[in-house]
Amino acid sequence: MEYTHQSSWIIPFIPLPVPILIGVGLLFFPTATKNIRRMWVFPSIFLLTIVMIFSIDLSIHQINNSSIYQYVWSWTINNDLSLEFGYLIDSLTSIMSILITTVGILVLIYSDSYMSHDQSYLRFFTYLSFFNTSMLGLVTSSNLIQVYIFWELVGMCSYLLIGFWFTRPIAANACQKAFVTNRVGDFGLLLGILGFYWITGSLEFRDLFQIFNNLIYKNEVNIFFVTLCALLLFCGSVAKSAQFPLHVWLPDAMEGPTPISALIHAATMVAAGIFLVARLLPLFIVIPSIMSGIALIGIITVVLGATLAIAQKDIKKNLAYSTMSQLGYMILALGMGSYRAALFHLITHAYSKALLFLGSGSIIHSMEAIVGYSPDKSQNMVLMGGLTKHAPITKNAFLIGTLSLCGIPPFACFWSKDGILNDSWLYSPIFAIIACSTAGLTAFYMFRIYLLVFEGYLNVHFQHFNGKKNSSFYSISLWGKEEKKKLKKKIHLLALLTMNNNERTSFFQKRAYSHRINRNVKSIRRLFLDSTHFGIKNIGFFYPQESDNTMLFSMLVLVLFTFFVGSVGISFSQEGIDLDILSKLLIPSIDLLHQNSKNSVDWYEFFTNATFSVSIAFFGILIASFFYKPVFSSLQNLNLCNLFQKGLPKKIIADKIINIIYDWSYNRGYIDAFLEVSLIASVKKLAKFNYFFDRQIIDGIPNGVGISSFFMGEAIKYVGGGRISSYIFFFLLIFLVICYSIFI
């Protein structure tokens, strides 16, 4: 046991040899390193597997002993200043280490196939391994200085990976946006760290918590200054975990490769913000105003993320807003003091969201074979549909992840989200109503994604026949190969031209009317198999194919996690059998809402609460199915919907309200536009003024002095050059000037 803890310092450094060796190989042996590039995935997975085994062993020790182990090395600079470095092993470290390693291993396996075509394959795995190293260093840090160092490394890795395809201007802008937005939060975090060091004189977590609690108990600190420092610390988590108002970088971060999106949204960057709040909760918990502010930011983010997701066309951005909303649930739980529920939802959400992102990557990968390497097309849900029969394994895996995130039992997120919803009723009925309503909205937008992608028919072929794109088009990739897909101009389908195939996918009447297309597909299905009726030869249509076994393996393992990881937090204790592994791991736990609870729930209370939350989820699923599932189009054929709408008063007003909601959601709540007008434009003007001031004033003064000195020296040189003609000239010139000044 003692030896295991003493060896824990090596955890962050175990994956580090891979990026080092790749860098050295590319520097000294570039050709050989690139020739064996596919082999580098094996040491990456092997080393991360060692860390996973180490983390599981530490977790078992934590469950049995519930101990906290901290080891510190002191580096004394002088008598007044010393820097301390070390590592902290507790339940939170164990949970995060297992989460990072398990998701990281599966993403590495998945990426080997997903990125195999990419010329920058080695660079990708270098960044990925260093990302895991940085995150492991963050969760094992024993003081705020180490936290800040690894915090910045995590931000740097996310910047590199979001802008991995930096030759695309959109990706380059996205990584800059993420970097700058996180700098705002990181600056607040740094100020908060300095403030608490000034208050307590220590940055070690144990000493910091103890000294600060004593100062608060004895009322020896200025409460306003303490609150300000705590708020600055929380700003770091707000930016990193994409909480309102520093959430604007998250949807743009989807410009990176899909495996990176899975890792960022499941176990690394956004999880870092939740980890920091959980780690510093002993500081926040003694300041009621900060706890209330954390809960308020959480509930705002819950609603905002869910409402912005309901009208997005890009499948990855839709999932990004979903992540934002679910992170809001975790921040809400931490603000309420429900420490266990927050960490439980962090665990379950990580595996479910990783499954959804890898599933979306499988879909995108298969769509690229048809529409080319263009994110605007391959990630556009309007062009998808009918993938159930073409990618059945991906469909089933994605459905399981969707059901889990919707809160449907027995999948993982049901157990954790249900706990947060129940605790919200104890904290604030208003917050509880909002949280429960958003749970229904979550089910709506998640099934909207599922139905648009997998139900109906593949809409990309109808896009080709809509009369707008009847010429050849190219699928150009700035990071991959160039392919050409030809469509003959001779194809004319009047029936298809008359179809309403809008690209605008709203959640009500503005959506693409897939049911109208479906009624005609049966009569033209032969077109997709044979083009001889049009006098054209060798014209066929391609359909998405199932991903290869490497990608499917990672998804199937995540399916198992989604099924069974919820069992670690089940709070049933019957006849001496305690299944609540999570509560054992978190003893002693910080939980304000259940201080006297024994972590057991009676069956009646459980079924009552579960029935309510599941009913809300099914209601959201039903609404999504009504508007997006093709089978419900028969209702409109029978004019039942029209009869219902005719009975509604002021239908025009209702349509206007729907349009406003759609536009607000599709345009990201106009938050980006507001920041562009109010903040970014002013910053650009200030930057231009600073540039002018720096070049013309700061640089102009010394440059002007230098130029003046040069001309003055040249003039003096001619005056004293030893030439008689120069002396006579200047003598006469001075004489004339004197005469002019005297007589005129």
Swiss-Prot record:
Pfam families, per database record: Proton_antipo_C, Proton_antipo_M, Proton_antipo_N
One GO location term (cellular component): chloroplast thylakoid membrane
Record field: transmembrane: 9-29, 40-60, 89-109, 125-145, 147-167, 185-205, 219-239, 258-278, 280-300, 327-347, 354-374, 396-416, 425-445, 552-572, 612-632, 724-744
GO molecular function ontology, one term from the record: quinone binding
Location within or outside the cell: Plastid, Chloroplast thylakoid membrane
Gene3D superfamilies: 1.20.5.2700
Top-tier EC class: translocase
Plastid among keywords: yes
Predominant cellular place of this UniProt entry's protein: plastid
Substrates-to-products reaction catalysed: a plastoquinone + NADH + (n+1) H(+)(in) = a plastoquinol + NAD(+) + n H(+)(out); a plastoquinone + NADPH + (n+1) H(+)(in) = a plastoquinol + NADP(+) + n H(+)(out)
InterPro entries in alphabetical order: NADH_UbQ_OxRdtase_chlpt_su5_C, NADHpl_OxRdtase_5_subgr, ND/Mrp_TM, NU5C-like, Proton_antipo_N
Annotated function: NDH shuttles electrons from NAD(P)H:plastoquinone, via FMN and iron-sulfur (Fe-S) centers, to quinones in the photosynthetic chain and possibly in a chloroplast respiratory chain. The immediate electron acceptor for the enzyme in this species is believed to be plastoquinone. Couples the redox reaction to proton translocation, and thus conserves the redox energy in a proton gradient.
UniProt family annotation: Belongs to the complex I subunit 5 family.
Subunit structure, as described in the record: NDH is composed of at least 16 different subunits, 5 of which are encoded in the nucleus.
Protein name: NAD(P)H-quinone oxidoreductase subunit 5, chloroplastic
Organism of this sequence: Cicer arietinum
